[in-house]
UniProtKB/Swiss-Prot annotation:
Organism for this UniProt entry: Lactococcus lactis subsp. lactis (strain IL1403)
Principal cellular location given in the protein's record: cytoplasm
Domain of life per record: Bacteria
Designated name of the protein: 1-(5-phosphoribosyl)-5-[(5-phosphoribosylamino)methylideneamino] imidazole-4-carboxamide isomerase
Gene from which this protein is expressed: hisA
GO-annotated biological processes: L-histidine biosynthetic process; L-tryptophan biosynthetic process
Length: 239
């Protein structure tokens, strides 16, 4: 199972939101590159980046910072937030050279666009982030709740050819109360998608629980920044 540390970017800083609320933000570092390099020294192989500015307005805002992190580490980077057109995808995958892009809003609103990307780049490089609030998919940086039930949407993604999804329970994100394993277990039973858990990780026991259930991956953010989890130990165990 992949253990993927996360850095959320806003105005060039590393931040975390509480339950996706842009007004409830904690700044953890003014130098996200240093954090990425620290993750690499600890034994991380992958890095989850979110451009929160991009997610909110639909345009990339931390591009040069992402490029710098890619150039100055050997981490396999996945990036999401504001990726809603072909030029942005091409820039990330072909120019900057990140390993994976994460589509959220675009996957909901433009399924034909998603299909084109899957054909051109393959499902290993196109990941869909499914953000869930009260049983429905949310978009636009979690600010808009759709009328789309999450299981129906996941079935649709599977039919289109998506292989990997990052599933976030918004009500858990940034709360340090543990992931919604009931939700993730249900999703795993209902389809064959690779499921990456995101939101609510509180300590090492959550990583161990996810490993036992054979999920594809788990994203760790606030639990690390608040000193609740020993990531170096988990990286050693994973390798």
């Amino acid at each position: 199972m992949k253990i993927i540390p996360a850095i959320d970017l806003q105005n060039g800083e590393a931040v975390r939101l509480y339950k996706g609320d842009y007004d409830k933000k904690t700044v953890y570092s003014k130098n996200p590159l240093e954090i990425a390099q620290k993750f690499e020294r600890m034994g991380a192989t992958d890095l989850h980046l979110v451009d929160l500015d991009g997610a909110k307005i639909g345009q990339t805002r931390n591009l040069e910072l992402v490029r710098k992190i890619k150039d100055e580490t050997r981490l396999k980077i996945e990036i999401g937030g504001g990726i809603r057109d072909f030029d942005t995808v091409r820039m990330y995958l072909e120019q900057i050279g990140v390993e994976r892009v994460i589509l959220g809003t675009a996957a909901v609103e433009k399924p034909d666009f998603l299909k084109e990307l899957l054909i051109k780049y393959g499902p290993s490089r196109i990941v869909v982030g499914v953000d869930i609030r009260e049983g429905f998919v949310s978009t636009s940086g979690w600010l808009e709740k759709t009328s789309l039930p999450y299981l129906s949407f996941l079935k649709k993604l599977e039919r289109i050819g998506v292989k990997t999804t990052i599933i976030t329970d918004i009500s858990k994100d940034g709360t340090l109360t543990g992931p919604n394993f009931k939700l993730y277990d249900e999703i795993s039973k209902e389809n064959s998608l690779n499921v990456i858990i995101s939101g609510g990780v509180k300590d090492n026991s959550d990583i161990q629980r996810a490993t036992r259930s054979d999920f594809y991956g788990i994203i760790v953010g606030k639990a690390y920044y608040e000193g609740k989890i020993n990531l170096e130990k988990e990286f050693r165990n994973a390798n």
